[in-house]
Amino acid sequence: MQAQKLEKSLLWEISGNGLEKSSYLFGTIHMTCDASLDDNIKIALDNTTLLVLELDMDDPNMQTEMMKGIYMKDGKTIKDLVNEEDYELLGAFLKEEIGMPITMVGNIKPFFLTAMMYPKLLNCTVQSFENELIKVAHEQEEEVLGLETIEEQLNVFEAIPYEDQVTDLLRSAKDNMAYDKETFQKMLELYDAKDLEGLNTMMMEDKNLSTTKHKDVMLDNRNENWIEKIEGFSKKQATFFGVGAAHLPGDNGVINLLRKKGYTVKAVL
């Protein structure tokens, strides 16, 4: 079943297929200048009794668990992955951007080093939709759960070869993040326009990112694994799901996979 073209919306109602009450699916962006929740989202949060994000973000052990998975396996370091010249370049870049010598952070997976620089892509104080959603859930005295464990999420970054991860980092260093900033701006514009189709096209076409090359690991396989969990939660109670917007569109996106299972998934406009 081909995915139909999606309307411009980040919030979707899941109903039918034996569900007693509607659940909601909201596409987040993990980093933005303004994470205010609009009225439709607030109403959906009022009408649900559980918040489920990609990870259980109010789990007190989350940071500790995360830290366990940020290092490369088998004592590998960036020095093993690049030539001498590129190593020098990365050293200067990391010192400049995160204020640490490469000898101290060289054993961290390149993906996580790239992520440390994400806040620099925005010229503002970074806000997150996940945090805003958690605030509301706590006000409503509701639980926050996750669709995957930290271990499962970390395995994603183990499945993408370190060589590919370091390619992204090196590209950022070579143009001093100019490409990253431009790409992120484009992504934010599409997100603010609620254009899931546009985001999907952008993901498919960006040949520079290892995440595009490994879309199956980053998105498709995870979406597939989430469906059963989304069904389980929704059958028990009206649930509000908040996951990265890139997970929603496309043939292997969460919206299409739920529709294939017989649910009605419609845009809240």
Each language-model region and where it sits:
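A generic structural signal for short, solvent-exposed coil/turn residues
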Residues: 4-6, 17-18, 45, 233
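Bacterial Sec-dependent N-terminal signal peptides
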Residues: 1-7, 12
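Tryptophan-centered motif/residue detector
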Residues: 10-12, 191, 226
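A conditional alpha-helix N-cap/helix-loop micro-motif detector
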Residues: 4, 34, 219-223
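A cross-kingdom marker for long, charged
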Residues: 212-269
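Amphipathic coiled-coil/heptad-repeat helices and related helical stalk/stem segments
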Residues: 7, 37, 129-130, 223-226
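Structured, acidic catalytic/metal-binding patches in enzyme active sites
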Residues: 14-24, 29-210, 214
